[in-house]
């Protein structure tokens, strides 16, 4: 939301509610810390990838990157997710590559299709962990989101921030976009800066894209081949990031369409966005919800998180050290 980027009359009017939000959050955190509210400790280490603000900071590409890094090092890893946007009421539930995004959520399906990682969804993180451990011998569990879910004890915390938007106007919800104050970053094990400019102590993450894949045929085509005018759509937390990336890569976008994060789509809704001669580009997260009614001119653009060699070594060494393994 644009009103969260700068201080305005509206944000100042909402500021008292932000103070109330902060007070309730602090009381809740204190109750968990004193064990007056019960929390669950997993038998295996838990690494949480979360954020202190709302709205599309890039957690999913980071989860995919981390899973692939751990799998390459022979670490048995599982992922738990809330399953936002899914309609299912059956919890906990394992997600596989054939799961319907409309039922279990778009992000879990994307993560499983990219990595094949064991993944369970439930609003109750304990249920998800117990289901995974009953089926798979795991060394580590990654929680996709859940930084503020203090009912789950954690061993490692990573926070992703948007390097361009940073902390917006600096206010907590609802006057701003923050769930917690920036001072929270001093207590986490790693701060990941997605795009923009990383501050000292932050690990810069870049999202790279090189090709588009046709939803209907599976054909892969380098983005440099899209020399004609294109239309782009995105139903993610911050759609401008996707559109700006395509423009930086040299694509000519005649029209862009922004949808709500986790929004469900149908054929009628999307059929009129682009003519049959014009490519319609979308995110991979949107594609998992559109494949069963895709048209011939629909393409999705996978993105991959990349880090410097130094950041990769540091991040992986810290995890492997915790697991009692070497980073070779």
Curated annotation (Swiss-Prot):
The gene is lpxK. It holds the Pfam family LpxK. Belongs to the LpxK family. SUPFAM superfamilies: P-loop containing nucleoside triphosphate hydrolases. It is an enzyme of class 2 (transferase). InterPro entries: LpxK (IPR003758), P-loop_NTPase (IPR027417). Transfers the gamma-phosphate of ATP to the 4'-position of a tetraacyldisaccharide 1-phosphate intermediate (termed DS-1-P) to form tetraacyldisaccharide 1,4'-bis-phosphate (lipid IVA). Keywords: ATP-binding, Kinase, Lipid A biosynthesis, Lipid biosynthesis, Lipid metabolism, Nucleotide-binding, Transferase. GO terms for biological process: lipid A biosynthetic process; lipopolysaccharide core region biosynthetic process. The keyword Electron transport does not apply. Its EC number is 2.7.1.130. Pathway: Glycolipid biosynthesis; lipid IV(A) biosynthesis; lipid IV(A) from (3R)-3-hydroxytetradecanoyl-[acyl-carrier-protein] and UDP-N-acetyl-alpha-D-glucosamine: step 6/6. It catalyses: a lipid A disaccharide + ATP = a lipid IVA + ADP + H(+). GO terms for molecular function: ATP binding; tetraacyldisaccharide 4'-kinase activity. HAMAP family: LpxK. This is Tetraacyldisaccharide 4'-kinase. ATP binds at residues 53-60. PANTHER family: TETRAACYLDISACCHARIDE 4'-KINASE, TETRAACYLDISACCHARIDE 4'-KINASE, MITOCHONDRIAL-RELATED. One of its GO terms (cellular component) is plasma membrane. It comes from Haemophilus ducreyi (strain 35000HP / ATCC 700724). It comes from the Bacteria.
